[in-house]
């Protein structure tokens, strides 16, 4: 099961504003997945696993650092969930709070950006990952790209690979492509 906590556009805008000014929101937008609803083997019987993508969190905090704020950030997200689902906090047996700095440390993704490139209008759709590099082709003949840095982005799991493979098949059927 999936759920989002972002009841209005104004709510989402306020959540983003905090990050824009170097802090995290006291009422963040939360995109949550309860994976064990789909795959019960992920948790013991009667229990569940839930992942929350809490937006928006700046890489650099204006008045502190993520090592200091990590648990408070987690408390903030948990309080928002509790406000929408009373009793939620009593059900949490364990949590791990992962900040943008943690993502960068663990994976090498610059500033913890999981989208493999800014997810802004100039780098979306046929501009993803950059103008002239869309359609999964590269300037190197026979070399293609896919992943969260390509259309439609990392939020649509599996789609970049499917779409890239379809591009490869179309090019093979038509005689390939000769780079750009």
PLM segments and residue spans:
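Conserved FAD/dinucleotide-binding core of flavoprotein oxidoreductases
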Residues: 44-76, 80
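Short glycine/proline-enriched loop/turn "hinge" motifs that connect secondary-structure elements
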Residues: 40-47, 134-138
């Amino acid at each position: 099961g999936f759920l989002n906590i972002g009841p209005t556009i104004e709510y989402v805008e306020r959540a983003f504003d905090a990050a824009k000014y170097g802090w995290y929101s006291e009422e963040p937008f939360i995109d949550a997945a309860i994976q064990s609803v789909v795959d019960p083997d992920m948790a013991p019987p009667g229990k569940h696993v839930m992942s929350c993508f809490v937006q928006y969190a700046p890489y650099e905090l204006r008045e502190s650092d993520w090592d200091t704020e990590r648990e408070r950030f987690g408390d903030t997200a948990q309080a928002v969930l509790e406000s929408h689902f009373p009793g939620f906090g009593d059900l949490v047996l364990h949590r791990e709070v992962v900040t943008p700095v943690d993502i960068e440390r663990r994976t090498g993704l610059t500033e913890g950006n999981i989208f493999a490139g800014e997810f802004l209008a100039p780098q979306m759709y046929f501009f993803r990952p950059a103008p002239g590099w869309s359609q999964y082709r590269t300037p190197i003949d026979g070399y293609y790209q896919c992943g969260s840095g390509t259309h439609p982005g990392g939020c649509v799991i599996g789609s970049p690979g499917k779409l890239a493979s379809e591009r490869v098949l179309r090019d093979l059927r038509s005689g390939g492509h000769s780079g750009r």
